[in-house]
Structures are given as structure tokens and as C-alpha cells.
From Swiss-Prot:
Role played: Part of the outer membrane protein assembly complex, which is involved in assembly and insertion of beta-barrel proteins into the outer membrane.
Name the UniProt record assigns to this protein: Outer membrane protein assembly factor BamC
Oligomeric and partner information: Part of the Bam complex.
Domain of life: Bacteria
Keywords: Cell outer membrane, Membrane, Signal
GO BP annotations, alphabetical order: Gram-negative-bacterium-type cell outer membrane assembly; protein insertion into membrane
GO cellular component entries: cell outer membrane
Origin species: Oceanimonas sp. (strain GK1 / IBRC-M 10197)
Signal peptide limits: 1-22
Predominant location category: membrane
Location in or out of the cell: Cell outer membrane
InterPro entries on file: BamC, BamC_C, NlpB/DapX
One Pfam family linked to the record: Lipoprotein_18
Length: 322
């Protein structure tokens, strides 16, 4: 038990984010350069010395010893896709990615979620928030969060500033600002990932356009691609090649047993067991899917009709993509 406690204590002391003082002695601060005059034996002349490169005596600049903070600097990290660190101050630029709501409102909501998840006291003020915070490796401080929209860049900056007085060192203030901003950025990225996961698992409507000889998915290209790649193996297709950038999937249909279709609670897919290519087309908010045989010839209308009878309810089922 004692050994475990010792390990825990040592691990805590060796944390580079919190240990600001070196773990060696500081006797070197009292040391001086010892010099002695050159002794010239009797009968010899003293050598001539070049005095051009003599190091002058001067006062020591900067901190040393126990006062020297050895912690690595904390850097503002753009953890969210479409974000960029500001060139001045502790802040991040976030660029508009979604069109369903204004970015400034979205960031306001994200900051509120961040404060509530971390049990942080906060108040809404003009163009931002004021909050308390305990940053890693820095004393507890008060912070001012400011949102600065830029209509030209279609972006909003989130800048955080420590509002503590002169009792906090400048290096601790900068470290705390960067640490708090990184914590918010990580929280925001997690929330965006959660929302993306919900969207990816949501139902997608799939219909047949008999006139064009293709299927239409009421979702964008990326989500339709993910849904298709997830479902194909479950529906009896072996994927032999896929190229998302080129928009096609090469498969071979091996079929499923009657019992497997009953377990899936889907209409059985009764098409020839052979090689196919599924070609996707990006239509903005919708995606087209066409089916061809191994010779890259469009399949018959009845084959496409049978495919949509099975694939459409599968695209609607959220339990099949979890």
C-alpha cells in the first residue's frame, strides 16, 4: 500500500502541466567563475593576449533557479474542423459549416453547454459571457468570453481573456486562457460529433425514378455513401472495390437465406447473383444511385425495382446502422 502511495505521489509531482519548478538543486546560483592570474616563470615574457573577445561582466538577465517556470507553453489548438487560431490573443476563428442556424447562435449554445457540463459559474453579458475557471497548471481565475462575428469571412471568433488583477503572473494568465479555450474547443467538437452521429443514423428516404432509371436518396452524398456502405454487406453484397471520390461501389450479390431476410424484417431481394456496380451522383441535398452489371450496362427495370423494394425500407431503418 505504501509503495502504491509513493508511486501516486511521484506521478503527481512529475506532471509537466503542474510542476513549475525543476527537481534538481539550485546551488549553481551561488557559483561564480573562478579565475586566477597567469603565472609567468622568471625569465620568460608574458604572452600577448587578444582582448577583442573578452566577455564583459554584466548583470544576469531573466529568472533562474526556483523562480524559473519550466512548464511547457500551452498552445491554442484548432480542434474543431473549420477552425483557425487567431494571430493575436487567445482566440479561435470558427467558420460557417451549417446553414440551418447562424454560427454565432450555435457558438453561444455551445459555450452554455460547456459551462453547464463543467459546473462553471457564468453570466451572459454583451457579445459573450463571464465565467470562473480552474485551468490546468494555473490558479483559479475569472474569464471574459467574447464572440466577434465577421460577415465577410463568414466566421465568428471566440476570444477568451483572463480578467484577474495584478496578482496573477502574465505567463499564468496566458496559460489559463489557452487551456480554457482548448477545453471549450474539445467540448464543442464532441457535441458536433454527437450531432453528426445522430444525422448519420437518421432515416433516409429512397425512391425510384423509373423514367431516369435510377434511385434518389433524400440526403446529401456523404451520408448516403455511409449508409450504403454500411447496409450492403448486411443485404448479401460483398464489396470488392469502392471509390468514394469517384462515386462507385463494385459488389457481388451472393443472396441471403429466407431466414436471414426474416431476421432482418425486410423484403427478400430476388435479383441475379452476379457482379454489379452502384454509381452515386452528388445532387446537392439529394443523391442519385444507378445500378449496372459487370459489363457496365444498366440493369433491367425489374431488377432496379426489386432493389428499391428492399433498399428503401433498409435506408429508413435506424437500427440497421448502429
Amino acid at each position: 500500500m505504501i509503495s502504491l502511495l509513493a508511486v501516486a505521489v511521484l506521478a503527481g509531482c512529475s506532471n509537466p502541466e503542474t510542476r513549475s519548478q525543476a527537481n534538481r538543486g539550485f546551488d549553481y546560483e551561488q557559483e561564480t567563475l573562478r579565475t586566477a592570474p597567469l603565472l609567468i616563470p622568471e625569465g620568460l615574457q608574458a604572452p600577448r593576449f587578444n582582448t577583442e573577445y573578452v566577455i564583459p561582466k554584466g548583470t544576469a538577465q531573466g529568472v533562474t533557479g526556483k523562480v524559473l517556470d519550466i512548464r511547457p507553453p500551452t498552445q491554442v489548438l484548432p480542434l474543431v474542423r473549420g477552425s483557425e487560431a487567431m494571430t493575436e490573443g487567445s482566440g479561435l476563428w470558427f467558420y460557417q459549416q451549417r446553414l440551418d442556424q447562424p454560427l454565432e447562435r450555435e457558438l453561444n449554445q455551445a459555450l452554455t453547454v460547456f459551462f453547464e457540463q463543467t459546473d462553471t459559474d457564468y453570466d451572459a453579458v454583451a457579445n459573450g459571457f463571464e465565467s470562473s475557471g480552474d485551468a490546468i497548471g494555473a490558479p483559479s481565475q475569472q474569464f471574459r468570453w467574447q464572440l466577434m462575428p465577421d460577415a465577410v469571412r463568414r466566421a465568428v471568433a471566440v476570444q477568451v481573456q483572463s480578467t484577474e488583477g495584478g496578482g496573477v503572473l502574465a505567463q499564468d494568465r496566458l496559460r489559463a486562457e489557452a487551456s480554457m479555450l482548448n477545453a471549450f474547443s474539445l467540448s464543442y467538437q464532441r457535441e458536433l460529433s454527437r450531432q453528426q452521429e445522430l444525422l448519420d443514423q437518421g432515416p433516409i428516404a429512397l425512391t425510384l425514378d423509373a423514367g431516369q432509371g435510377l434511385l434518389l436518396a433524400e440526403q446529401d452524398y456523404d451520408r448516403t455513401w455511409k449508409r450504403l456502405i454500411t447496409l450492403l454487406p448486411r443485404l448479401g453484397f460483398d464489396i470488392s472495390n469502392r471509390q468514394q471520390a469517384l462515386g462507385y461501389v463494385d459488389v457481388e450479390f451472393d443472396g441471403l437465406s429466407k431466414g436471414d431476410w426474416q431476421d432482418l424484417r425486410l423484403p427478400a431481394l430476388d435479383i441475379p447473383e452476379q457482379e454489379y456496380r452502384i454509381q452515386l451522383g452528388d445532387l446537392g441535398s439529394r443523391t442519385s444511385l444507378s445500378l449496372s452489371n459487370k459489363d457496365r450496362e444498366p440493369v433491367a427495370a425489374d431488377v432496379l425495382s426489386k432493389l428499391v423494394n428492399t433498399l428503401a425500407p433498409a435506408f429508413e431503418r435506424t437500427d440497421l446502422v448502429r
